[in-house]
């Protein structure tokens, strides 16, 4: 595997978005992963609709939370997902618009072996990967720069996306895309320590990784 991967430098990652006061991190994580694999497969980087997932994915709970795999399944079953432009974000759950376009589709989704950071690294080398982390603690919330080493627990309360990895001064890290706007963290991103002692990964990052597949 390459020692350094950053999908942003390959133009495969959209600019940072902001979920605002809505518990829709799951939709932002899923959409970002889909945007990236679509760019990798087709060469087109299109901003897609988190709001469609919030309004239309009945397996999830809108602004009260959800899971990325349910979001991927919605996109598969629906035959695609609309663009951000056609179905813009409002940060509140509304009724599902019947006239929505199927602009980008996926074939399926794959779970990465749980609690295994080397399997996770292998997956991220091929495309950005959706993961869950515990983000409720003050140290995570107040992160600004450098490699975050905790402390944090492993409750799966926030969905984010790993868009790369590397090593700095002997410390391995993940490049993690958040959905709290560009003013949070390091321009919307957090570098999280990688290959920690716990198999769950820092803040539980290796507990539930998955990614969308596209032929």
UniProtKB/Swiss-Prot annotation:
One Gene Ontology molecular-function label: cysteine-type peptidase activity
Any single GO BP term: proteolysis
Post-translational events: Not glycosylated.
Tissues expressed in: Laticifer.
A single GO cellular-component term on record: extracellular region
Disulfide bonds: 22-63, 56-96, 152-203
Annotated coiled-coil segments of the chain: none
Family the UniProt entry places it in: Belongs to the peptidase C1 family.
Biological function: Cysteine protease.
Protein's name according to its UniProt entry: Ervatamin-B
Native source organism of the sequence: Tabernaemontana divaricata
Lineage: Eukaryota, Viridiplantae, Streptophyta, Embryophyta, Tracheophyta
């Amino acid at each position: 595997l390459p020692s350094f991967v950053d999908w942003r430098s390959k133009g495969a990652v959209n600019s940072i978005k902001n979920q605002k006061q809505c518990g829709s991190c799951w939709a932002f994580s899923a959409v970002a992963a889909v945007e990236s694999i679509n760019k990798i497969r087709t060469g087109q980087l299109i901003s897609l609709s988190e709001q469609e997932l919030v309004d239309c994915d009945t397996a999830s709970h809108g602004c009260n939370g959800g899971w990325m795999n349910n979001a991927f399944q919605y996109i598969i079953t629906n035959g695609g997902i609309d663009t951000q432009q056609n179905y813009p974000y409002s940060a509140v759950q509304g009724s599902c618009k019947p006239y929505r376009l199927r602009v980008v589709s996926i074939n399926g989704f794959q779970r990465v072996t749980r609690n295994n950071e080397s399997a996770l690294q292998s997956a991220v080398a091929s495309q950005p990967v959706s993961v869950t982390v515990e983000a409720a603690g003050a140290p995570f919330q107040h992160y600004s720069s450098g490699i975050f080493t905790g402390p944090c627990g492993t409750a799966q309360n926030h969905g984010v996306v790993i868009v790369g990895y590397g090593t700095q001064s002997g410390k391995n890290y993940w490049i993690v895309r958040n959905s709290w706007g560009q003013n949070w963290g390091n321009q919307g991103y957090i570098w999280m320590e990688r290959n920690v002692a716990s198999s769950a990964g820092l803040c539980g990052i290796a507990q539930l990784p998955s990614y969308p597949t596209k032929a």
